[in-house]
């Protein structure tokens, strides 16, 4: 799967910027409060080829660099169904994203 980025500064004429590789089933995403990291849930459907069951971490400040992947419980038969950052966890989410990059 891919994440497609658009420039929406002119909403009536969105401009395609780039496609960033994620994983099979790239679906929901959430932006960190500082707008640096994009977390992408990769589980569109629980079907072969439609669900990697991971979360891709993308650094938008570095031109859409894929930092890595967060493993979920796919091996145990679970897939993420939605993704969100909780208010009290913003700092921890940014910290974890920066650790994935190391």
Task: Kindly give the residue locations of the regions a language model identified.
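Predominantly soluble domains enriched in secretory-pathway, periplasmic, or organellar proteins
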Residues: 1-102
């Amino acid at each position: 799967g891919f994440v497609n980025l658009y420039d929406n500064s002119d909403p009536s004429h969105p401009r395609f910027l780039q496609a960033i590789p994620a994983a099979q089933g790239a679906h929901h995403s959430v932006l960190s409060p500082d707008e640096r990291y994009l977390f992408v849930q990769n589980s569109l459907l629980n079907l072969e080829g439609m669900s990697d069951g991971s979360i891709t971490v993308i650094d938008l400040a570095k031109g859409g660099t894929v930092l890595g992947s967060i493993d979920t419980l796919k091996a145990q038969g679970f897939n993420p169904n939605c993704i969100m950052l909780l208010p009290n966890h913003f700092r921890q989410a940014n910290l974890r994203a920066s650790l994935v990059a190391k």
